[in-house]
């Protein structure tokens, strides 16, 4: 089986960079942190929602981010929880006057 990556240490960041380039109007790096995956524009009139987790075999948490869904996802390494810095930067990128709800499992 072939691996489709350059370097395992850079796998998550390179994957995220590819997603940002492929869908620039749907996703962006919050607070200049590539691991703070957010939907552009702060939600108005609702509580912001942040989720996240390890990257795993598929970027499952990224699929929860979008209009009418979660406002951001903090991304960790493969099978590793996101860092507190990634969670904080995701929070800062999506926070508004209505607060932030966290959905981590």
Sequence positions of predicted segments:
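Acidic beta-strand-to-loop metal/phosphate-binding motif
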Residues: 97-105
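Glycine-rich, flexible N-terminal cofactor/catalytic loop recognition
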Residues: 35-67
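Aromatic-enriched hydrophobic runs in primary sequence
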Residues: 11-13, 20, 51, 59-64, ...
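Conserved active-site and cofactor/substrate-binding residues in soluble primary-metabolism enzymes
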Residues: 6-14, 44, 56, 60, ...
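Fold-independent oxyanion-binding glycine-rich loops
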Residues: 23, 52-54, 72-73, 104-105
